[in-house]
UniProtKB/Swiss-Prot annotation:
Biased composition (Basic residues): 480-489
Record carries keyword Phosphoprotein: yes
Organism of this sequence: Saccharomyces cerevisiae (strain ATCC 204508 / S288c)
Sample GO molecular function, one term: GTPase activator activity
Record's protein name: GTPase-activating protein SAC7
Lineage: Eukaryota, Fungi, Dikarya, Ascomycota, Saccharomycotina
């Protein structure tokens, strides 16, 4: 029986209070003075504390939260509890030697850094380190100038938001899904491409991308405006309270913003027409008051405009003091936010709302986090930069373009100076000639083979006015090889003869379609040697070229007129069509420079004489073997053409 009574008693003691008794239980617990005491709780040091020699350790009672799980706690008890909690915190802070503000900041920073779990070298690091890992180039569309570089994650998110999120309601204010944002963060933090090739946005929403952009900017090691320039960026508006009052009382917006949703209230004065004797005097006084108000308004507007222009001028000078990486990212971000502010009638995110969201990442200071006045001034500065970015950005873009041109010019000078010291280029001797220059302008010029063992010389444009002493050219400045090959060369002659241009390098004659074209006109770009048959076919084709369309004329008759062809030695030459402005009736001969012989000028003179007299001459001697081969080939071609002409003549006679 005693055992049964003990069991029943233990059961009664373990019964928990019902839900209805919970509020009364908490009232009794809080009103109990022992529950609020800060007395120490003795805890034995080891399990063998039952011995007499055991020394207990002291632990402080943890403070309870001001709002327990029951919402029926009286306000009086909550106030008394909050006072006691503050006293306990003050005692603890006095013992530790740190202020509550510093402890809260440390706890907040630790929580933010550990909450997102940043890994890698993109998120949660300095801007310079993030750019060294993954960066994208920004190009200004209006001027096609490379403005600078920004992080890949900012470039990708900005491009996606511009295309899909301009009219999304609550953009940047509504948070995205945590899992999806973390997945995007992992993509842009993973090597080797760090999200450069990522384009699979279908599984993510606009708010996910906006949250990723905010997360990157908020977790930079330092705000975009560095702490050393924090006060300097706030001074232009702090020293002009007229601008601050205007921004607090009026909604500042871009002049091109669509304001279809904005409510405009116009003050309307009700005029009472009473038949009194003093109606005329009242109307005069009202007119004077209206005129005075209008003058005040105009005067205030002029002063406000003057202050705004002066502030913009100061900000232009301040942006120059920023580093290139910070300046480029800040300008890109201001331009992005101004686009969303212009669409505020759809996305409900005006410049004021956007400034409140992005102010911590653009302009903030750790000592002013808990100060509402300082926070408001920083927010107004960011709002001013967003709304008047259309005034700031053109000037900054001009500065960036000027700096880029200066940098390129200095690099070119250094490169040219190094090349002058290391690789001087000799100019070959060139003699004057009466024939106009022939210029080849193939769209796809053949590649130069440096391993070719044949003797070739570079063809340079020849002018009709060349000094007699060729030594002057050699003593002049050395030419520099161009970095990129031009699609065609230009004539530098003094005569107003435009260069002939070959329209296409895929022309085929309708008379000899099986013949191989010379190397300079072939699609493969081979620099093969010209045979007499190929040269004759080219000459026949170019004599039948339409001077207006520069296309080969079609031959309808089966007869071939008797032609006199000039044998051409082995050489590299430039081909061209007929020039409509040229005074020559026939195609001018190409100027050929050969490096195998020293008498290149004599060869040019001989070729020009043979062309002017229209007489057939023998080929210029190069070597004995080459001359024998060409003579045998020419005899075969002459017999072949004679048979062809005899057949066509007999057919016509028949």
């Amino acid at each position: 029986m005693p055992n049964n009574t003990l069991k029943q008693g233990s059961k009664i003691e373990n019964v928990s209070p019902s839900k209805g008794h919970v509020p009364s239980f908490w009232k009794q617990f809080i009103n109990n003075p022992k529950s609020m005491s800060s007395e120490n709780i003795t805890v034995p040091r080891s399990p063998t504390s039952l011995s007499r020699n055991a020394q207990p350790t002291t632990l402080k009672r943890p403070p309870l939260s001001s709002r327990p799980y029951s919402y029926n706690t009286p306000t009086k008890d909550r106030k008394s509890f909050s006072k006691s909690a503050k006293q306990n915190n003050n005692n603890n802070n006095a013992n530790s030697g740190t202020s509550p503000h510093a402890e809260f900041k440390n706890y907040r920073d630790m929580f933010l850094s550990n909450r997102n779990g940043f890994t890698g070298r993109v998120f949660g690091v300095t801007l310079a380190e993030s750019l060294s890992v993954a960066s994208a180039e920004v190009i200004v569309q209006s001027e096609l100038v490379s403005f600078g570089r920004i992080p890949i994650v900012v470039a990708k998110c900005g491009a996606y938001l511009k295309a899909n999120g301009l009219e999304t309601s609550g953009i940047f204010r509504i948070a995205g899904n945590g899992k999806r944002v973390k997945a995007l963060q992992y993509i842009f933090s993973s090597p080797p491409d760090y999200g450069t090739k990522f384009n699979d946005w279908e599984t993510y929403t606009v708010h996910d991308v906006a949250s990723l952009l905010r997360r990157y900017l908020n977790n930079l090691a330092e705000p975009l405006i560095p702490l050393s320039l924090y006060e300097q960026f706030r001074n232009p508006l702090r020293s002009r309270p007229r601008i601050l009052r205007h921004m607090l009382t009026h909604e500042v917006s871009h002049p091109n913003a669509n304001k279809t949703n904005n409510v405009t209230v116009k003050s309307s004065r009700q005029n009472y027409n009473d038949d009194g004797a003093n109606d005329g005097d009242i109307e005069k006084e009202d007119a004077k008051d209206d005129e005075e108000k209008r003058r005040r308004k105009i005067r205030h507007k002029r002063r406000l405009t003057r202050d705004i222009r002066a502030a913009i001028k100061e900000y232009e000078e301040l942006f120059v003091t920023l580093s290139n990486d910070t300046k480029q990212l800040t300008i890109y971000l201001l331009d992005l936010l101004s686009l969303f502010a212009r669409q505020s009638q759809f996305n409900l995110m005006s410049g004021r709302n956007l400034a409140a969201i992005f102010q911590p990442s653009i302009l903030s200071h750790p000592q002013h986090d808990m100060d509402p006045k300082e926070y408001e001034l920083s927010r107004l500065v960011v709002e001013f930069l967003i709304e008047y970015s259309y005034k700031l950005l053109p000037h900054l873009l001009k500065l960036a373009k000027r700096e880029q041109q200066e940098r390129l010019s200095t690099e070119n000078k250094k490169n040219n100076g190094d090349k002058q010291k290391t690789d001087p280029i000799e100019i070959p001797k060139i003699t004057s000639s009466d024939s106009p220059p022939i210029v080849s302008s193939n769209k796809n010029p053949p590649a130069i083979d440096n391993n070719n063992k044949l003797d070739h010389t570079t063809l340079s444009p020849i002018s009709t006015s060349i000094p007699e002493n060729s030594s002057d050219l050699q003593t002049s400045k050395m030419l520099k090889p161009p970095k990129q090959r031009r699609p065609h060369s230009k004539s530098f002659g003094s005569t107003p003869v435009p260069p002939d241009v070959i329209a296409s390098n895929k022309r085929r004659t309708s008379l000899f379609p099986w013949l191989h074209k010379p190397g300079i006109l072939s699609d493969t770009g081979d620099n093969g040697d010209l045979t007499a048959t190929e040269a004759e076919g080219d000459d026949y084709e170019e004599e039948n070229v339409d001077p207006y369309g520069q296309s080969p004329s079609s031959v309808h008759s089966g007869s071939l007129p008797k032609q006199h062809y000039l044998p051409i030695p082995r050489m590299n030459r430039s081909l061209s069509g007929n020039s409509t402005n040229s005074s020559f009736n026939t195609r001018p001969i190409s100027m050929i420079l050969t490096s195998g012989n020293d008498n290149s000028a004599d060869q040019l003179e001989l070729l020009s004489n043979t062309h002017s007299n229209n007489e057939r001459s023998n080929a210029l001697p190069l070597t004995e073997d080459d001359g024998d081969e060409r003579n045998s080939r020419s005899r075969k071609r002459e017999s072949w053409f004679q048979r062809l002409t005899s057949r066509s003549g007999s057919a016509n006679r028949a």
